[in-house]
Regions:
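Alpha-helical transmembrane segments and their immediate juxtamembrane cytosolic regions
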Residues: 2-402
């Protein structure tokens, strides 16, 4: 154990020393928290139960609506889009200054997003085919595939906004916010068609993305602006929930008439503004914490494989659920219906098992997140720094800025 700690400390020191002094470590910390929030949120509210011989998804939020505030902690996608807009706007401006073409820049960005996708889609296409050939119920296969593929909507939206960065980087967040408000008013207030809500898939996430782009240009240098986002977004969210008829949960709940997330509603966007305000307020404290080599190394390495963690976390949950069937078909918190507080406590005990399974997936598939050249050499180039070889442990600098 002592040797392991020594080796980890040495690795952390190498990562810390290889990080450029000008790098804003709080950006990486915010991205890491956003990814972990989504992963833990899914693990806490995703249950697989058998009904009428088929596997179905269930959520404790449906049986215990008073748990809705939990979703306020773990629905962190707005922070991810905030960071994404900030990094993309900075990256595009830097690439343009270096004479890099838009095509080369966007290919590099989108490659980092979609390289890991091929592996998860290929594996689950094989698994789904095997299950169907083995006689599994189509509804069971559909439930499993929905859990695996549902994160891909996020990647598609994020990729579209990334590709549009030169066009949207200077748009005021008020414009997409107005689109979201108008779509909701038409849909809920004037009986408009439901499909109009899907306009919010782009407009809703464009709000935090453009906030991030504004951040890259020097906005939010004063705490007052970030505090306004936090307080204003929080008050607006509370008003929309209490008097506007919006659900309190910031994630989808099976059987609910309205989802705040699918597509995003004005309440979800207002809540995202509050999240972004809080994220911008804690930049200073986060930057100070990130000066600790061991803490920074954990954040840096997570950023290096952020997409792998995001894409495979539901596979990890399903793997543990399937392995558990070898021992019992009624393990609390794993196979049982999420209808009581006891289920929540039991599910918490399964989180280390999910994390262990995710670690196995990470070990097997993280290679797909790296550029092909990085797989065959033990050196990498640190972006926005002199192009000299650096230790492999610092490879996060090139791969982490997605």
């Amino acid at each position: 154990m002592r040797e392991l700690r020594t080796r980890w400390s040495a690795l952390a020191d190498r990562v810390d020393s290889a990080t450029p002094a000008h790098r804003d470590r709080s950006v990486d910390a915010l991205r890491a928290f956003a990814i972990l929030g989504v992963v833990l949120g899914h693990w806490l509210v995703t249950a697989l139960t058998v009904t009428d011989g088929s596997l179905h998804g269930a959520s404790p939020l449906a049986a215990m609506p008073w748990l809705a505030p939990v979703s306020w902690v773990f629905q962190t996608l707005s922070v991810f889009f905030l960071v994404g807009g900030h990094v993309a706007a900075q990256g595009h401006a830097s690439a343009k200054a270096r004479g890099v073409s838009y095509g080369a820049w966007v290919r590099q960005r989108l490659g980092r997003l979609f390289r890991p996708v091929a592996a998860v889609l290929t594996l689950w296409a094989i698994v789904a085919g095997g299950l169907l050939l083995g006689g599994a119920e189509p509804e069971t296969v559909r439930t499993l595939l929905k859990l695996v593929w549902s994160p891909l909507w996020f990647l598609l939206v994020f990729a579209a906004l990334t590709a549009a960065t030169p066009l949207v980087a200077r748009i005021s967040p008020l414009w997409p916010l107005a689109v979201v408000a108008g779509a909701d008013a038409w849909r809920f207030g004037f009986g408009g068609p439901e499909w109009i809500g899907w306009v919010n898939v782009a407009a809703g996430w464009l709000v935090p993305y453009t906030l991030g782009a504004a951040w890259s240009r020097g906005a939010f240098s004063r705490r007052r602006q970030s505090l306004f986002l936090l307080v204003g977004g929080g008050v607006a969210t509370a008003a929309l929930i209490l008097w506007g008829g919006y659900p309190a949960s910031m994630v989808g709940v099976p059987g609910a008439a309205v989802s705040n997330l699918n597509p995003p509603t004005l309440a979800a966007v207002a809540f995202g503004l509050a999240q972004c305000g809080l994220a911008l307020l804690v930049r200073g404290p986060l930057a100070r914490v990130m000066r600790r080599p061991r803490t920074w190394a954990k954040v840096a390495l997570l950023n290096l494989s952020a997409m792998t963690v995001f894409l495979w976390h539901q596979t990890a949950l399903m793997t543990v659920t399937a392995v558990g069937l070898l021992f019992s078909t009624d393990l609390p918190g794993l196979h049982t219906t999420p209808g009581s507080v006891g289920w929540i406590f039991a599910r918490l005990l399964w989180l280390p098992a999910f994390a262990a399974a995710l670690t196995v997936c990470w070990s097997a598939f993280r290679v797909h997140e790296q550029p092909r050249a990085a797989r065959t050499t033990r050196t990498a180039v640190i972006s926005a720094a002199p192009r000299v070889p650096v230790p492999r442990s610092a490879r996060f600098e090139e791969a982490g800025r997605v």
